[in-house]
């Protein structure tokens, strides 16, 4: 699973996920399913935000290529992926500027057009069950909830899906592709079932122990199918700024 995650997701997403797990004392090499789940959630948050802007009148527009007009600003503020201190600083700044109620839990995004925080969910289960769990945890009508599943289903507060149909379809397609590729590698069942994941981990650890006298052959090639998974959605104009903002610690 770890190899799949590192090949499947944008390096910046992987780096952010590793940083988030280490902040809570978790090891991406051991808790590989959680590693995959965090990367998936991060990517959905970025895809939700990318290419969406607001103009000087506060109207929402989509710009998919080229340099956006200087008067445009990103419609969504990405909060997910930042360290907790910085994330709360961003939330507090938004609340002080807009007068919006401060959320009890850190949200994933802030929508400048609708003046609301958004909680994004990505589930391997039924969307309505996960939606209710999120709603019961947040207990705030001010935070908008939007849930996506790997089967193409979605659910949002008051059936308000925020984004246009094409943008949401892009997210659903990506999730469905991840599921298919996991399944083709025998990873999907363990991703859905934690008990199966533990058994798979023990099996993997045993397989990593080389037999005495046996030659070891390692392939570093990427399959043609996996190449289709490489995310093309990243807004190149924004990537550098995000990296500087989210990843302040230089690589060693």
Curated annotation (Swiss-Prot):
**Localization (cell):** Host cytoplasm; Host nucleus
- What keyword terms does UniProt attach to this protein? Decay of host mRNAs by virus, Eukaryotic host gene expression shutoff by virus, Host cytoplasm, Host gene expression shutoff by virus, Host mRNA suppression by virus, Host nucleus, Host-virus interaction
This chain belongs to the protein called Protein PA-X
> What remark about domains does the record contain?
The probable endonuclease active site in the N-terminus and the basic amino acid cluster in the C-terminus are important for the shutoff activity. The C-terminus acts as a nuclear localization signal. The C-terminus is recruited to host protein complexes involved in nuclear Pol II RNA processing.
Q: Which residues form the active site?
A: 80, 108
Q: Which InterPro entries match?
A: PA/PA-X, PA/PA-X_sf
Disulphide linkage map: none
Site residues, Important for efficient shutoff activity and nuclear localization? 195, 198-199
């Amino acid at each position: 699973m770890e190899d799949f995650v590192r090949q499947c997701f944008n390096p910046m997403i992987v780096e952010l996920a590793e940083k988030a797990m280490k902040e809570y004392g978790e090891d991406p090499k051991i808790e590989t399913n959680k590693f995959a789940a965090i990367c998936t959630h991060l990517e959905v948050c970025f895809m939700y935000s990318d290419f969406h802007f607001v103009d000087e009148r506060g109207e929402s527009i989509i710009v998919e290529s080229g340099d956006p007009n200087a008067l445009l600003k990103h419609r969504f503020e990405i909060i997910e992926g930042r360290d907790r201190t910085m994330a709360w600083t961003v939330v507090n700044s938004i609340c002080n500027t807009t007068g919006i109620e401060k959320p009890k839990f850190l949200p994933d995004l802030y929508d400048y057009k609708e003046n609301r925080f958004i909680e994004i969910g990505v589930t391997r289960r039924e969307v309505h069950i996960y939606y209710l769990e999120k709603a019961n945890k947040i207990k705030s009508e001010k935070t908008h909830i939007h849930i996506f599943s790997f089967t193409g289903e979605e659910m949002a507060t008051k059936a308000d899906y925020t984004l246009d149909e094409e943008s949401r379809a892009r997210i659903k397609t990506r999730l469905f592709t991840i599921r298919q590729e996991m399944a083709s590698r025998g990873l999907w069942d363990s991703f859905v079932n934690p008990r199966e994941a533990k058994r798979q981990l023990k099996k993997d650890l045993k397989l990593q122990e080389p037999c005495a006298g046996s030659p070891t052959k390692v392939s570093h090639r990427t399959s043609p199918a996996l190449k289709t998974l490489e995310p093309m959605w990243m807004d190149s104009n924004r990537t550098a700024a995000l990296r500087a903002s989210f990843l302040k610690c230089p690589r060693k």
